[in-house]
Amino acid sequence: MAKTIQAIRGMNDCSPTESPLWQWVEGKVRSVLQNYGYSEVRMPIVESTPLFARAIGEVTDVVSKEMYTFWDNDEQLTLRPEGTAGCVRAAIEHGWIYNQEQRLWYMGPMFRHERPQKGRYRQFHQAGVEVFGIPNPEIDAELIMLTARLWKELGIAEHVTLQLNSIGSLEARKNYRSALVAFLQQHVDLLSEEEKERLEKNPLRILDTKNQALQEVLNDAPKLLAYLDDDSREHFAQLCALLDAVGIQYEVNPKLVRGLDYYNKTVFEWVTSALGAQGTVCGGGRYDGLVEQLGGHATTGVGFAMGLERLVLLVQEVNQSIRLPSAVDIYVVYQGEGTTLAAFQLAETLRTELPQLRVMTHCSGGNFKKQFKRADKSGATLALVIGESEVQNQQVVVKHLLGGAEQQTLALDDIVDYIKNNF
């Protein structure tokens, strides 16, 4: 026997029993985004490597350690580690945002070479939203309201908490960076080698350290909010007032900075502790300089992304009220001379007349006992039975697989109306 080939570590298959929940979650995401008037876009999963280096920042962990990069002739390409950079590139390239506002969303796989763990994999899926051309804090509030509505739709609203911060302008962050570095240099003995490297290249990333001793020291560190420019401070105050007005609770977290360099002003995360250690379910913020940084006209931007693996896990963990549909509603079984043609004609008629129902035809042969066993396993509500006598009499037997109702024999011409009225 030939040696079997396994999936790549951190890149998972989605089984037939898992996919209904994924489809349900993705359907809720699409529904809420469409309800708010957002338009779907689709971008390639492979982009030019310099796109991410320029957008995300060369000293970030994502670019320096986690990207899947390869050469195609003379061009360096990367499997996308996130969606914002590609969406901005597409918007500039196709003129979607020139002198106009855009509310866009996308969904698909992303790739990062991280250590696989629960809810975090090397191939993972994100739903993302990007809004261009609206500088006001109202749109920041709308994105947060949108996500809050989605959590209600998914039945997880009681298990997520909103954390909010403002990281101000580039100039404000430079001033804060100097103060933070001066503070951390007094505690350099607590820093790991990786954190010492961050101190040199990207000190703000130390604020979300998992080092417990350092976390306690950081409680006394300078607060970024104290270094905000007036415009950022006013923007943040208006955002908080809007969230207060619509009743969305939040916690101002002065250590929240996000892991990508393109953010400014508002940053936010929805976090949960229902999956063990506190984890981020959704995160985003403003990136008002990114479009210009990637060669477009100066255009404001704000967005978020949510990890679908973690979202599916959270729904599984806390929402026990979901009733997912089975893969099959009606199972057509047949046995005997001339029954195959009749069964296939019946199944196609049902698919035409009742397109909302899922109709499966048994194609494996075998006696009725074997076929009913397969019908039960499919989760179907009804089995429609065609034998030789049913073919001769233009009839079909209706067998209820759930609920215990007695089986009935109906004329073929009546079966569509019967199912419409009773199913």
Curated annotation (Swiss-Prot):
HAMAP family reported in the protein's UniProt record: His_tRNA_synth (MF_00127)
Keywords of this entry: Aminoacyl-tRNA synthetase, ATP-binding, Cytoplasm, Ligase, Nucleotide-binding, Protein biosynthesis
Catalytic activity: tRNA(His) + L-histidine + ATP = L-histidyl-tRNA(His) + AMP + diphosphate + H(+)
Matches recorded under PANTHER family: HISTIDINE--TRNA LIGASE, MITOCHONDRIAL-RELATED (PTHR43707:SF1), HISTIDYL-TRNA SYNTHETASE (PTHR43707)
BP term (GO), one: histidyl-tRNA aminoacylation
GO molecular function: ATP binding; histidine-tRNA ligase activity
EC code(s) of this entry: 6.1.1.21
GO cellular component: cytoplasm
Key word Aminoacyl-tRNA synthetase present: yes
Family per similarity comment: Belongs to the class-II aminoacyl-tRNA synthetase family.
Subcellular localization: Cytoplasm
Gene name per UniProt: hisS
UniProt-listed InterPro entries: aa-tRNA-synth_II (IPR006195), aa-tRNA-synth_II/BPL/LPL (IPR045864), Anticodon-bd (IPR004154), Anticodon-bd_dom_sf (IPR036621), His-tRNA-ligase (IPR015807), HisRS-like_core (IPR041715), HisRS/HisZ (IPR004516), HisRS_anticodon (IPR033656)
Complex formation: Homodimer.
Protein name, UniProt field: Histidine--tRNA ligase
Main location: cytoplasm
Gene3D superfamilies on file: Anticodon-binding domain, Bira Bifunctional Protein, Domain 2
